[in-house]
Amino acid sequence: MASLATVLTITVGVPTAWILARRTLPGKDLLSATLLTPLVLPPTVLGYYLLMLVGRRGVIGRLLSAWNIELAFTWRAAVLAAAVGSFALLIKTAQTGFESIDHRLEQAAQTLGHSDWSIFWTVSVPLAWRSILAGTVLSFCRALGDFGITLMVAGDIPGSTQTMPLAIYDYVQANDLSRANLLALVSVGFVVLLMLAVGRFARLRY
């Protein structure tokens, strides 16, 4: 689920970060502050408001129900919850990368007739790839470790919406510390190996 959440985060977050870095929008500061609220708000608060949106009585939930699509307390809700919790990390990191690019390079591409979409893919993204990669890894690790938002929106349903943090919590509650320790070690080991691999890849590409 963390992988799907990261794909969703990249799809929405990278273009959003570029727009925030390169475009002057009305209410841009308010939008930036709103997008960064997941970094400071308690996960249960985020989960509550998200549930109010996607639940059966929520605005999004009602629209989806008209198409016989259930979102709350399904695996899709777990993916959405993890994406919402990690979205701000990718946006902030990628935005910093885009802002560090020399404007003249993008302006040169524009004078050659490239569209904004073409400039984004052929100039901005290649030059900011390190920041995008760093943000992707951070958001993936955040999605992998999400607990509060997922519990509020998707529940703790074994075989459906239960994630590794939720499983660890359940094992601790059941006093099954051996399984809790095993999952915790797997989680820590995976994240450490991932960080080492990404660091090595970044050095090779330098």
Predicted regions and their residues:
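C-terminal transmembrane helix and the adjacent membrane-cytosol boundary/short C-terminal tail
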Residues: 27, 88, 95-111, 177, ...
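Membrane-interfacial helix termini and adjacent extracytoplasmic/periplasmic loops
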Residues: 47-83, 154-157
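Interhelical loop and adjacent transmembrane-helix boundary motif
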Residues: 152-192, 196
